[in-house]
């Protein structure tokens, strides 16, 4: 009788066949709802930032006239002239689309616990992947902007921003916006990892050494 009483107290009044006793997800649900809301807002923010960086780069164009004696040479600077900047634009477009789709999927999901394990793992890996990809692409664009601004004497590359100042300024603005997007995506990667951890964590009360203990 004494053991039954102790077992009953340990399980909040449950006395019955030893085994697994389900407990409420109320506490976890509240936290998951907050993370779900934060995830939606941050994904929409990341999408907006990536689109802003993309549009800023795509609309960046400047023409300069070089006069040599009686000859005038016209040169136009735009993102399509540099492979790194083209990859920058394409990558931001893909990540913006991914962020929008993930936000919409999260909105239509009925609850955090109804989300499949496979989707949580997929989201976790994709969120990590796009952060690394965007860091690499933005780093390459930053290097291009730096060389255009400072030149590279070792390979006799002259400065270009003296002639295309507005173009360089707009490239810099696009890169800065993209770095803010990276910070947002890093936060999302941490958030998706936490959501996966909570979903995978046992949320049942199990018997151990004759007593019922919670795994939460």
UniProtKB/Swiss-Prot annotation:
Keyword Transferase among record annotations: no
Name of the molecule in the record: CASP-like protein 2U1
Extracellular compartment spans: 59-86, 149-170
GO cellular component terms attached to this protein's record: plasma membrane
Residues that span the membrane, as ranges: 38-58, 87-107, 129-148, 171-191
Compartments, record wording: Cell membrane
Spans annotated as Disordered: 1-30
Subunit composition and interactions: Homodimer and heterodimers.
Residues exposed to the Cytoplasmic side: 1-37, 108-128, 192-216
Topological category with respect to the lipid bilayer: Multi-pass membrane protein
One Pfam family of this chain: CASP_dom
UniProt lineage: Eukaryota, Viridiplantae, Streptophyta, Embryophyta, Marchantiophyta
Superkingdom to which the source organism belongs: Eukaryota
Location (main, coarse): membrane
